[in-house]
Amino acid sequence: MIGMIITATISVALIMVLLVLAGTFTWVERRLLGFVQERYGPNRVGPFGSLQWVADTVKILTKEDRPPPGADKLLYILAPAVAATPVLAGFGVVAIGDGWALSSVDVGLLFLLGMLGLTAYAAVLGAWASNNRFSLLGGMRAAAQMLAYEVFLGLSLMGVVMIAGSFSMAEIVEAQRGVWFVVLQPLGMALFTIAGIAAAHRLPFDLPESENDLIAGFITEYTGMSFGLFFLGEYLAVLLVSALAVTLFFGGWLGPWLPGPVWFGLKTAVIAVAFVWIRATLPRPRYDQLLSFAWKVALPLSLLNLMLTGIVVVARSAS
């Protein structure tokens, strides 16, 4: 009983920390975008606008939130929760230090990939429930995009699994004590980065909610806290993909002098900022180009990477 209470307390604390980190990340992103676009960005609420996300949260909480006419109310309300909850659950298996994980399971990587994949259901549910043609188009795009990119997202990580010999996040990190896997798996890292951006629906792969041609895609009819939960899920997904990249390719918590969790946080912050930089600099492709790249280029490359890694692993074990 006491153990359950402790676990529940730690879980609630972790969720609160993640919510604060997601809010802070929105401010960091807006400041960086302002810098790239030669403008100030948020600078009114708090030092350098650092509390702007708090003001935005209050604004969202006080806005009216009701389904549009003709909407499926149950699915309309359920979709935003599906957008944020699986991502929060995914952080439960992320180890930020030696023994610093809410749940250490042998198949942590598979669990995390499954949680990332569930976010596509939120887009489809929200699109269908909204009774809006633009929302429906955005939901169809989200489903097709996730189907295409989830395949080579998993395949791009199988090289790491083959080298480490485990799906456990902690064991994968420990296997990088000699050399980080980004050195051994540069192609896998590049493919994972592309797939991770697509899985999080981030620019330049935000086609399911493309403002230029779909108004706001599957979130067109959402307002208030329902919109906020979709927004929260997107930014948490970026942080989760960044943490996963650090764990699988950049040595996780390994590093000299500083404590492991500090190293993990610094590395994750660098990767997250890199995602913002990609958003600020790269144009959005056409939707057919996005899917063609996934099936005709990325998938064959991920299979090639898997085959070459298998040959090397077998050759090393034989010698």
UniProtKB/Swiss-Prot annotation:
- Keywords per UniProt: Cell inner membrane, Cell membrane, Membrane, NAD, Quinone, Translocase, Transmembrane, Transmembrane helix, Ubiquinone
Q: Per its record, what are the GO molecular function terms?
A: NADH dehydrogenase activity; oxidoreductase activity, acting on NAD(P)H, quinone or similar compound as acceptor; quinone binding
Q: Which BP terms does GO give this entry?
A: aerobic respiration
Enzyme Commission numbers on file? 7.1.1.-
Q: Which GO terms describe its cellular component?
A: plasma membrane
Q: Which domain of life is it from?
A: Bacteria
Q: Name the Pfam families on file.
A: NADHdh (PF00146)
Q: Does the keyword Translocase apply?
A: yes
TM annotation in the entry: 1-21, 77-97, 107-127, 147-167, 179-199, 214-234, 238-258, 262-282, 293-313
Q: Where in the cell is it found?
A: Cell inner membrane
Membrane topology type, per the record? Multi-pass membrane protein
Report the catalytic activity: a quinone + NADH + 5 H(+)(in) = a quinol + NAD(+) + 4 H(+)(out)
The UniProt entry, under HAMAP family, shows:
NDH1_NuoH
UniProt lists the family membership as follows:
Belongs to the complex I subunit 1 family.
Functionally, this protein is described as follows: NDH-1 shuttles electrons from NADH, via FMN and iron-sulfur (Fe-S) centers, to quinones in the respiratory chain. The immediate electron acceptor for the enzyme in this species is believed to be ubiquinone. Couples the redox reaction to proton translocation (for every two electrons transferred, four hydrogen ions are translocated across the cytoplasmic membrane), and thus conserves the redox energy in a proton gradient. This subunit may bind ubiquinone.
Oligomer and partners: NDH-1 is composed of 14 different subunits. Subunits NuoA, H, J, K, L, M, N constitute the membrane sector of the complex.
Name of this protein: NADH-quinone oxidoreductase subunit H 2
Source organism per entry reads Rhodopseudomonas palustris (strain ATCC BAA-98 / CGA009)
Upper taxonomic lineage: Bacteria, Pseudomonadati, Pseudomonadota, Alphaproteobacteria, Hyphomicrobiales
Q: What is the primary gene name for this protein?
A: nuoH2
